[in-house]
Amino acid sequence: MKLLAFRRLLRIQRVVIRYRLDDLILELPMLPWWLRLLGATLPWRWLPRRKLELTRGARLRLALQDLGPIFIKFGQILSTRRDLLPDDIANELAWLQDKVPPFPPELAVKRIEEQLGAKIEQVFARFEREPLASASVAQVHAARLKSGEEVVVKVIRPNLEPVIRSDIAWLFILARLAERVSSEARRLHPVEVVSDYEKTIVDELDLLREAANASQLRRNFEGSPLLYVPQVYWDWCRPKVLVMERIYGIPVTDLETLRDQRTDFKALAERGVEIFFTQVFRDSFFHADMHPGNIFVSTRAPWSPQYIAVDCGIVGSLTDEDQDYLARNLIAFFKRDYRKVAQLHIDSGWVPAETKVNDFEAAIRTVCEPIFEKPLKDISFGQVLLRLFQTARRFNMEIQPQLVLLQKTLLNIEGLGRQLYPELDLWATAQPFLERWMRERVSPKQLLRNFQQQVEQVPHLSQMARDTLERLSQPHAHNAPPPEWKGSRHDWLGRLVGAVLLVGAAEVGLGQQLEAWPAWVMLAGGVFLILRR
């Protein structure tokens, strides 16, 4: 392992010198003066150099390609972090292609047989040794099961784990070094970025996780005319082998073939947006790797086109708080209510409570007002989120990984949608989803359902009430600090009674009794007592 790490270090050094990445590093404004001086004395900087007619982004992209698949994937992920990188570098890294030569079919067969515990002929009636596709982590072969189903077999590359461990270790070393020498680098959280990447790549190595993701996404869209997800054949899935239904569709970028079959491009573009918002606001679970290589269009019913999604190795999930953040901010943004956007961030704790709302509002207005001078149909949701993240980061907002994934996915969907149908108006398509979701969030039925989820707390309520009343009656008993109640004791007792009524409403509303009038009465009374001032 140490020998491998040393060899990788030498390889990294050679690539840095070849593409003169040291020039890029020394240009960083966050670099301390003493490190800049030390870097200027590096031995190879005194040697004759060949002239590089390349931009800094192109040099970085080529260097990552030379360093191999793990660095390529890291560059791809970095390209989505436009809240961290300059646009010219992010745009160049987006061109990184995760394509590598296939490994020998004998190794693929050997790994499949090891994982399945059976000879290839015992499982498959036919197995095509020439792979359909090959990438940095895995390659895919076509096959037919003994039972007759046409399938694809995805198999993880052999001997990949040691290389990943070595490369990740060096990325962590570089990230920690950056944090130690520069306060500006610490603000960008490089160690956190590498940690997110490590989790992504480790997750991609577990094909059972990908199978589970695909299975859930398929279940979420079962019978839907919008999206089809291939079936997983669980009997033949293992950590390093995945067997799925083979699909036959048109690559979404093959516009000529789509035109030939008279596909409705407007419907196709709008359905892509509809699929995204359905995943986000209905399911709280979304395919986070929706680049064109993973999306196909069914050949059936081109007048009502259906998408086909593959490769569910990267997915995102959202909490209620994430959904609320996204919906409220997007609605406020498109109303150009920057004050509300700023206040939402502070009230929800996304930015520190001591943040001055006027300063935050002004910063948001400065970066977003130019965007909203365009017609609504020309505005990019992804760019709006990106500008918000960039601004909020300056106010010490911790950007959650799932929101970064969502922003990247939204940019992909937007780019694809406008490639298919340039007149696509995302706001017109998305607005009904956002407004319907907001209405449902405050509907009485949803409130009752939320309380039902918390009904396990009911047994603790009486003890909590007793403890609270004891503290109210003896606020300065013993050496306990006086509680910081907002308002009078009667206000707090009213809120306590309101809480009891709300929990009671949840109890009455359990099962099929959501329409029972006592539940509605208790709900109304509880809300009144809690919210009254």
Curated annotation (Swiss-Prot):
Keywords: ATP-binding, Cell inner membrane, Cell membrane, Kinase, Membrane, Nucleotide-binding, Transferase, Transmembrane, Transmembrane helix, Ubiquinone biosynthesis. It is an enzyme of class 2 (transferase). It is a multi-pass membrane protein. Its EC number is 2.7.-.-. The active site is at D289. GO terms for cellular component: plasma membrane. It is found in: Cell inner membrane. Pathway: Cofactor biosynthesis; ubiquinone biosynthesis [regulation]. The chain crosses the membrane at residues 24-44, 510-530. GO terms for molecular function: ATP binding; protein kinase activity. Its main location: membrane. Residues 126-494 form the Protein kinase domain. It holds the Pfam family ABC1. The keyword Transmembrane helix applies. Is probably a protein kinase regulator of UbiI activity which is involved in aerobic coenzyme Q (ubiquinone) biosynthesis. Belongs to the ABC1 family. UbiB subfamily. NCBIfam families: PRK04750.1 (NF003404), UbiB (TIGR01982). This is Probable protein kinase UbiB. It comes from Pseudomonas aeruginosa (strain UCBPP-PA14).
